[in-house]
């Protein structure tokens, strides 16, 4: 997998950046990470699936219909890659905060659900997860900030509500931020800064 690593302050969090689909790559969220915490360690990973020349983290069968077998396979591969990076760069999985946008937020959800003992915190911008769970993970140690669009052209409102319920039903601590559409906004960055400050207090 292609990635960028930047060592930060040992007491600061580790941001694992997972980009969106449209033109996204491992550089896309770096300015946002810098805005959120200049001292954070950063691991930014490019999705290794190409759809019409655009980078994704897993295949889909159609808009809103995921290839579930590929989602599981790519999720496990990403988990192993993060484990290897943690060993190589000597940081703890406990310090990881996923910063995921759109497709990147979706693969982050997969990791939070399948490895709740490894990952506990995430900022998820405009996620959608139309998946029936085969397991019932215990997410009582998980905290997520969900940033959702009231008029998102990609994620219908019922799908945003489904993500909220997914985390709440499995015991996670959930904070919601509501915006208008699918693009990232300055409001979301400010809300994320506040959430991160509360998380570390």
Over which residues does each language-model region extend?
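Short beta-strand/loop motif that positions the catalytic acidic residue
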Residues: 145-148, 152
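Alpha/beta-hydrolase fold nucleophile elbow
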Residues: 90-100
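Conserved alpha/beta-hydrolase "nucleophile elbow" surrounding the catalytic nucleophile
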Residues: 19, 100-101, 149
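Gly/Ala-rich beta-loop-alpha elbow adjacent to hydrolase catalytic centers
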Residues: 99-104, 108
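Serine-hydrolase catalytic machinery in alpha/beta-hydrolase-like enzymes
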Residues: 1-91
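Conserved alpha/beta-hydrolase "acid-adjacent" motif
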Residues: 153-159
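A conserved short beta-strand
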Residues: 117-129
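C-terminal catalytic histidine-bearing segment of alpha/beta-hydrolase fold enzymes
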Residues: 161-164, 168, 172-201
